[in-house]
A protein has these predicted regions:
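Alpha/beta enzyme core
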Residues: 2-204, 209-262
Length: 262
């Protein structure tokens, strides 16, 4: 039986129907008030999952504020995960690496694989999502995704926002910003479909907006992760509006995306 079956039923359905919306509070965001506000906006706007920094106190705070919203915790240190899972996290994520690139911290394929193996050894039954670093060439991203399946990953997440260099205004600029992660989602989805009898779901994240989340689903993703479009806002009503716009954009195309995957 797949470990994904251990997820809350609403989250399982969102993945299976290729309409998952994850709101990312930020791997380095340990401000409990800010994280709670983001989680509440995610829940009010119709998100399926909130991704927060790996801290048991934050998990407990979000669970209290939003009891129906599943929590994913992100870190690059596997030893941090067990306490967060014990506090109520539904799943764990190795990533999001974007926070480290400005510091010059780069994650290679071997390091990501080793982090995955260590996490799986610590938490053999917990759902594990792993981000494929966008700094790798696309063919190496594809190979790493396939290798991560063998290492115990349950979901694969793409990234790419920090490598994008949009130079246009409006919708065209939003598409340019999302191009790297969209390309990764397409390439990795195809690689997993070719290499695996039961391909893992792919989550497309980094640099997405309501304009580009439908493209992510069309590229083969089972869902999307959105961070800065929500967490950079200071007004909760504005956050809710953005999340709701993302939800509507996904729901408008999710039935078509699900049919294409059959």
């Amino acid at each position: 039986m797949s470990r994904l079956s251990s997820l809350p039923v609403t989250l399982r359905h969102a993945i299976a129907e290729r309409r998952l919306l994850k709101v990312i509070a930020g791997l380095t965001n340990f401000d409990a008030v800010a994280v709670e506000r983001i989680a509440q906006a995610a829940a009010a706007g119709g998100a399926d999952l909130v991704d927060i920094a790996c801290d048991p106190g934050l998990v407990a705070a979000v669970a209290t504020a939003c009891p129906q919203l599943p929590v994913c915790v992100s870190a690059v240190d596997p030893e941090l995960f067990p306490a967060a899972v014990a506090a109520g996290a539904a799943m764990v994520e190795i990533g999001n690496f974007d926070a480290f690139y400005p510091q010059g911290r780069i994650f290679g394929a071997e390091e990501v694989l080793e982090l995955t193996r260590r996490t799986r050894a610590l938490l053999p039954e917990v759902v594990l999502s792993v981000t494929v670093p966008h700094v790798l060439p696309l063919d190496q991203q594809e190979q790493l995704a396939v290798d991560l399946v063998a290492a115990g990953a349950d979901l694969i997440q793409t990234e790419g926002g920090t490598s994008a260099r949009p130079f246009s205004a409006g919708s065209l600029g939003l598409i340019e910003k999302a191009a790297p992660t969209l390309a990764a989602a397409h390439a990795i989805s195809r690689a997993l479909a070719s290499a695996c009898a039961d391909p893992l779901p792919v989550l497309c994240a980094s640099g997405l907006s309501a304009v580009t989340v439908p493209m992510a689903l069309a590229s083969g993703a089972a869902g999307v992760g959105v961070g800065s479009a929500v967490n950079r806002l200071s007004d909760e009503l504005a956050m809710v509006a953005v999340v709701r716009g993302l939800r509507e954009a996904i729901d408008a195309v999710a039935p078509v995306a699900a049919l294409r995957s059959v």
